[in-house]
Amino acid sequence: MEAETSTQEVVKQVKNLPILMEDAPVGSDDHQLQYSYTFSYFMRPTGKFDPEDYASYVQPVGIMKSVEQFWSIMVHFKRPTEMCDKADIHFFKTGVKPVWEDPANCKGGKWIIRLKKGLSTRIWENLLMAIIGEQFLVGDELCGAVCSIRNQEDIISLWNRNADDTPVTNRIRETLRSVLQLPQNTVLEYKRHDDCLRDQSSYRHTTKNICK
């Protein structure tokens, strides 16, 4: 019996949590977005948690295809500065999961901005408006953004598809500085998602200003 148990294969299954807000058609007077986006969030479950199970706990909130739908969903979220618990808020192109292993993310990486508590709401909202307004001018290269609420700081990251495309990755960094009006001495860190997979961490062992 013991031998049978020891060789038993355990298969992890992602819990496909139902979306909280139904997908709605774009109204005739709405301002349609170039891409469809999905809001979702993750809150760490109580007790023991395996990072490999992250995707199982991502709760989709709603899909937006227009500016009007974007704001109709935004009003249902607490602002990052109002959140106390450790959580991640995701804003990704529809069909792209907010995990390193997703085909759109696995060869990419992310620019990371660390913020003192109390500053994340303005930066986060400005970043989302820049994304839906296509201010980055890199098309499919952007995958999405994450706002991570932590005890000592908040962290905002912008994910791109191809970490090896230095000119585009560089352009994303400079556009981030511009649209968020960051001081020139603000440190932006970069981390490839294959490195995240190796060390099972999103924000440790980053590289500062990797693209010179």
Swiss-Prot record:
InterPro entries: TIF_eIF4e-like, TIF_eIF_4E, TIF_eIF_4E_CS. SUPFAM superfamilies: eIF4e-like. Pfam families: IF4E (PF01652). Enriched in somatic cells. Disulfide bonds join 143-147. It comes from the Eukaryota. GO terms for cellular component: eukaryotic translation initiation factor 4F complex. Keywords: Disulfide bond, Initiation factor, Protein biosynthesis, RNA-binding, Translation regulation. eIF4F is a multi-subunit complex, the composition of which varies with external and internal environmental conditions. It is composed of at least eIF4A, eIF4E and eIF4G. eIF4E is also known to interact with other partners. Completely dispensible; null mutations have no effect on worm. Belongs to the eukaryotic initiation factor 4E family. Recognizes and binds the 7-methylguanosine-containing mRNA cap during an early step in the initiation of protein synthesis and facilitates ribosome binding by inducing the unwinding of the mRNAs secondary structures. All 5 eIF4E proteins bind monomethyl cap structures. Only ife-1, ife-2 and ife-5 bind trimethyl cap structures which result from trans-splicing. Translation of trimethyl cap structure mRNAs may be regulated by intracellular redox state; disulfide bonds change the width and depth of the cap-binding cavity determining selectivity to mRNA caps. This is Eukaryotic translation initiation factor 4E-4.
